[in-house]
Amino acid sequence: MKERSTELVQGFRHSVPYINAHRGKTFVIMLGGEAIEHANFSSIVNDIGLLHSLGIKLVVVYGARPQIDANLTTHHYEPHYHKNTRITDSATLELVKQAAGMLQLDITARLSMSLNNTPLQGAHINVVSGNFIIAQPLGVDDGVDYCHSGRIRRIDEEAVHRQLNSGAIVLLGPVAVSVTGESFNLTSEEVATQLAIKLKAEKMIGFCSSQGVTNEEGRIISELFPDDAQQRIDVLEQAGDYHSGTVRFLRGAVKACRSGVRRSHLISYQDDGALLQELFSRDGIGTQIVMESAEQVRRATINDIGGILELIRPLEEQGILVRRSREQLEMEIDKFTVVVRDNLTIACAALYPFPEESIGEMACVAVHPDYRSSSRGDMLLMRVAAQARQQGLQKLFVLTTHSIHWFQERGFLPAEVEMLPKKKQALYNYQRRSKILVLDL
């Protein structure tokens, strides 16, 4: 008898909305040389092939810093930098081109066979490289000639779009030519960032050695706004980190985000399946740089009723919440505040004001099981308390049978039935015997 896998079923159900949302979108993937050297790179390439098979338009940008440094060491060349930018003289340029060319051939070959030994074996992936980027020299700075180190002059985004629309993966590296036919060494973060901006990409994705950006406790920070990310960059650079995958990607992500790229994702190249988990799960696995959070706290609308019902039904069945019908919710929806993450309602609460007595009830407080160890309840309490103050209310009360200590830890004090508004006293259920707690606003 075959075994049933409920985890597979649940995972597929959760991923389907993201499969639909990502189809037809353009993603720019930045692969640093460190990621290419790692043992997990074959799995990353296979996952890139899987994304392509799902109808996602992909531009892959690869870097070659460790490969270039290894080439220089082999040929007894000492790398030179000015203001943390490599100086690429003619001899160095030849070694840069050699390293970049070998990587291009290797990545192309791997992508071409990425769907082998999968149910999609036989599906053809067309990988295209070309002179989509025109470069120009960095020039001379403080009397230092950067020689063949360059920057992007322009991108032929229309040509890139044509290749993407024809079903190809576009592969670009750190070497580009100028209008005079010279070759220049570019940084992979500049190439990936400018491509993401010019192509109006939905996402830019980068790989680093860790799972993302961590806080002081070592926990992954799931979201950063550009200003917060810039602060992280400043701290890393002050510590002497100018070239790690994390700092290079964050520099590009901040610029991309401020230029219209909705989300930039930083994930680990060491974790098998990190790319898929980041893109096809609600909470991901790494760090996102975003202009607007994937999670919103807002007033509920009539379109939120289904999500609220799905959230509160299990609690009603356990007797934790008083049952509410759909009709009642429709009539009272303007009283509700919701926390929504990627179109899933993960928390809700309602405020029922009694203005004659300057008091309000916080009711129907519910948080999705996956988020109860986080601060969503506190977010709701802060929002509902702010709404109560705006309405001129001086106190907030709750009736609870299971969350007494949670509310007391946040300043609520025990009270008697007589302290409730007159209308609420008349409706108090003595059989349920809910505890009454009051917060002075």
Curated annotation (Swiss-Prot):
Chief location of this protein within or outside the cell: cytoplasm
GO BP of this protein: L-arginine biosynthetic process
UniProt entry keywords in alphabetical sequence: Acyltransferase, Amino-acid biosynthesis, Arginine biosynthesis, Cytoplasm, Transferase
EC top class, as a word: transferase
Enzyme Commission (EC) number: 2.3.1.1
Catalyses which reaction(s): L-glutamate + acetyl-CoA = N-acetyl-L-glutamate + CoA + H(+)
N-acetyltransferase domain residues: 295-434
Location in the cell: Cytoplasm
Gene3D superfamilies: 3.40.630.30, Acetylglutamate kinase-like
Pfam families linked: AA_kinase, Acetyltransf_1
GO MF, one annotated term: L-glutamate N-acetyltransferase activity
Alphabetized CDD domains for the sequence: AAK_NAGS-ABP, NAT_SF
InterPro entries linked: AceGlu_kinase-like_sf (IPR036393), Acyl_CoA_acyltransferase (IPR016181), Asp/Glu/Uridylate_kinase (IPR001048), GNAT_dom (IPR000182), NAGS_kin (IPR033719), NH2A_AcTrfase (IPR010167)
PANTHER family attached to this UniProt entry: AMINO-ACID ACETYLTRANSFERASE, AMINO-ACID ACETYLTRANSFERASE NAGS1, CHLOROPLASTIC-RELATED
Assembly information from the UniProt record: Homohexamer.
NCBIfam families: N-Ac-Glu-synth, PRK05279.1
Homology family: Belongs to the acetyltransferase family. ArgA subfamily.
Protein name: Amino-acid acetyltransferase
Organism phylogeny: Bacteria, Pseudomonadati, Pseudomonadota, Gammaproteobacteria, Enterobacterales
